[in-house]
Design a protein with these regions (language model features):
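P-loop/Walker A NTP-binding region and its immediately flanking N-terminal helices
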Residues: 130
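Conserved short loop/turn motifs at secondary-structure junctions
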Residues: 69, 106-120, 382
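A glycine-rich helix N-cap at a beta->alpha junction
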Residues: 88-105
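A charged helix-plus-loop insertion that forms the helical arch/lid used to bind
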Residues: 68-88
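Structured secondary-structure scaffolds
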Residues: 2-49, 53-56, 121, 192-503
Length: 503
C-alpha cells in the first residue's frame, strides 16, 4: 500500500516576480501563475486557508525596467518618473491577475507598498549576515561602458551572443543570456550598446560578490537529496547538476595549433579530447580563478573559445541608481544598489511579512513559515530561472546560517530549503516567444477578448508543463488554422461542461 501524502502545517506558495517593464503576457499566467494558483487552492482545502500564504509581486528594479523607461521617454510616449512607469505596469499586471482569478494573498512589489519597505529591511539584514559570516568578497571586474552615452551599461543595456558552450539562446546580455546562463561580461561575444548601438568599452568597477563556488559540495548534496524525493521534476535536477561541472574552456579543434602555442602560459590544467560528434576539445582547470587567468591569456592572444557551465562568484551589487539600496558594508561603496536577481530571491520573504501584517497578524512570525520544519515553501518557476533558485538561492540560504559550518539545510530559526516546482517552456504556435525576441507572445488581457478565464485555465493546466514543453495554439490567433477544425483551447472546457451537464 502506498503511503498517504503528508502535508505541512503551514505553506507558502510563490509565483515568481514579473519585471515591472510591461504587463503580463500569456506565458506569465500559463507557465507560473495558474499552476501556482491551482496548488495554493489545493493546499487551502487540505490544511486550511489561514495556513497558506500565496505571495508574489512586481520586480520593480533591473535593467529591463531602465531600458523600457528610457525608450518610452525618448519616444515621447511617457513623461512620468521611473517609479510612475513601474507603478503603471504593476497596476496592469494586478488587473490581469485579478481577471484570471489568481487568488494571491498579496501582489505588491519589491519597491511598492509595505512590501517595498520590508524588502529594504530584508536586503540590509540578508547581505549584512552574509558579510558577517565571511561569504562575500569585493571584486574589481570589467564592466561595459558606453563612451558615447557617457554611462555604464548593465544587463539588457548590452546585447551580444552567449559565450557558454552549446547555448542556443536567442539573446545574451551583459552577464547572462535569456536561457539563464551566467558568465563574465568580458566573455560576451560581439557586445553592442542597446543605447547607442556602439561597441562598449570595458572599465573596472568594484562590487560585492557572494562566493558561490565555495558551496559546490553543499549544493551537490542538496540536489542529491532532492533527486530522491517523490515529485521532483527531472529538469530541476539536470539543470542544477549542469552547473556543478568543473571550470572548463572549450576550443574548436581547428584552433588546436594556436592553443598549443600558448599552452605553457596557462595555469595548471588538463586537456579533454572532443566528445564524439563534437568539434571542440576542453581545457579543465582546478578553480574558477585559474580559468579566469587562462581566459585573460587567451584574450590577449586572440584565441577564440567558449566557456562551460560552472559555479562563478554571484554578483550582489551594481551601480544602477534605480534599485534597492545596498548596505554600506565597509564604507567603500556607499552608493551601491543591489542587483535585481539576488534581492528577488528573498523578496517573497518580504511579501510574506507584508501579507501577515496586512491581514492583522504579526510580520515577525514570518520565520514560522520560512524557518520551520513543519512548514514548507513551494516556488513555481520557469525552467530558465532554475540557476537562480536551484543553485544561487540554495547556497545563499546556506550562507545565512550562523554559529556552525553551513549545513545542507537549516535548523532552528534558520531558513529552510524551498521546494522548487519548475515548468518547461510554454510555446506559442510551436515556437518560443518572448517580449524581447522575434516572436512576440500575446498579452494575457488580449486573450480574454476571445476566451473566458476558465477556458484558458483548464487548457493551460492540461498541457503538463511539468513534464515537457508544450505549445499554446489558439485558433483565433492562428492565421493558418483550418476553419472546420475545432479550437484546441476549448477542448478541456468543453469536456468538463459536457460532464457537468450529465451529472
Amino acid at each position: 500500500m502506498h503511503n498517504r501524502p503528508e502535508f505541512p502545517k503551514r505553506a507558502v506558495v510563490t509565483a515568481g516576480m514579473p519585471y515591472g517593464n510591461k504587463g503580463l503576457h500569456f506565458g506569465h499566467i500559463a507557465g507560473v501563475f495558474v499552476p501556482a494558483d491551482v496548488y495554493a487552492r489545493f493546499l487551502r482545502d487540505r490544511i486550511g486557508a489561514g495556513n497558506v500564504l500565496f505571495v508574489s509581486g512586481t520586480d520593480c528594479f533591473g535593467s529591463p525596467i531602465n531600458e523600457g523607461y528610457r525608450k518610452l521617454v525618448e519616444a515621447g510616449d511617457f513623461d512620468g518618473t521611473i517609479a510612475d512607469y513601474v507603478q503603471m505596469n504593476h497596476d496592469a499586471q494586478k488587473a490581469a491577475l485579478d481577471a484570471y482569478d489568481i487568488s494571491l494573498d498579496i501582489f505588491e512589489g519589491s519597491g511598492i507598498g509595505l512590501s517595498g519597505v520590508k524588502q529594504q529591511e530584508m536586503t540590509d539584514a540578508f547581505i549584512t549576515r552574509l558579510y558577517d559570516n565571511g561569504w562575500l568578497e569585493k571584486l574589481s571586474t570589467p564592466q561595459f561602458y558606453d563612451a558615447q552615452a557617457g554611462t555604464f551599461l548593465n544587463g539588457r543595456q548590452v546585447i551580444g551572443r552567449c559565450p557558454v558552450q552549446g547555448c542556443k539562446s536567442e539573446k545574451a546580455y551583459a552577464d547572462e543570456c535569456d536561457l539563464g546562463h551566467q558568465y563574465d561580461p568580458v566573455d560576451l561575444i560581439a557586445p553592442k550598446s542597446a543605447i547607442t548601438g556602439q561597441t562598449p568599452e570595458m572599465r573596472e568597477v568594484s562590487n560585492w560578490y557572494f562566493e558561490l563556488p565555495r558551496f559546490h559540495d553543499l549544493i551537490a548534496a542538496h540536489i542529491e537529496q532532492v533527486a530522491g524525493m517523490c515529485g521532483t521534476r527531472r529538469v530541476l535536477v539536470d539543470e542544477v547538476e549542469s552547473f556543478l561541472a568543473p571550470p572548463i574552456i572549450y576550443i574548436q579543434e581547428k584552433f588546436a595549433d594556436d592553443f598549443s602555442a600558448i599552452e605553457a602560459e596557462l595555469p595548471p590544467h588538463s586537456v579533454l579530447p572532443a566528445e564524439k560528434g563534437k568539434s571542440s576539445f576542453g581545457v579543465e582547470f582546478a578553480s574558477i580563478a585559474e580559468r579566469e587567468r587562462a581566459v585573460e591569456v587567451m584574450h590577449a592572444h586572440g584565441l577564440r573559445f567558449r566557456t562551460g557551465k560552472t559555479l562563478v562568484p554571484f554578483r550582489l551589487t551594481g551601480n544602477i541608481e534605480w534599485g534597492v539600496k545596498a548596505p554600506d558594508l565597509d564604507g567603500t561603496l556607499p552608493d551601491a544598489t543591489v542587483w535585481c536577481w539576488p534581492e528577488s530571491l528573498w523578496a517573497p520573504i518580504a511579501f510574506s511579512q507584508a501579507a501577515l501584517e496586512e491581514s492583522g497578524r504579526d510580520a515577525t512570525d514570518w520565520r514560522a513559515w520560512w524557518c520551520s520544519d513543519d512548514a514548507r515553501v513551494y516556488q513555481f518557476i520557469g525552467q530558465d530561472n532554475i540557476y537562480f533558485y536551484g543553485v544561487a538561492q540554495t547556497a545563499l540560504w546556506q550562507g545565512t546560517q550562523t554559529g556552525h559550518e553551513p549545513h545542507v539545510d537549516g535548523t532552528g530559526d534558520e531558513l529552510r530549503q524551498t521546494t522548487l516546482v519548475p515548468n518547461y517552456h510554454i510555446l506559442f504556435m510551436g515556437k518560443k516567444a518572448s517580449s524581447s525576441g522575434a516572436i512576440k507572445p500575446p498579452m494575457a488581457a488580449e486573450l480574454l477578448d476571445h476566451y473566458t478565464p476558465e477556458q484558458l485555465r483548464a487548457h493551460w493546466i492540461s498541457l503538463g508543463l511539468g513534464v515537457k514543453p508544450a505549445s499554446f495554439s489558439p485558433k483565433v490567433l492562428d492565421p493558418n488554422a483550418n476553419e472546420k477544425a475545432p479550437d484546441p483551447v476549448l477542448k478541456e472546457s468543453a469536456l468538463l461542461a459536457n460532464i457537468f451537464n450529465r451529472i
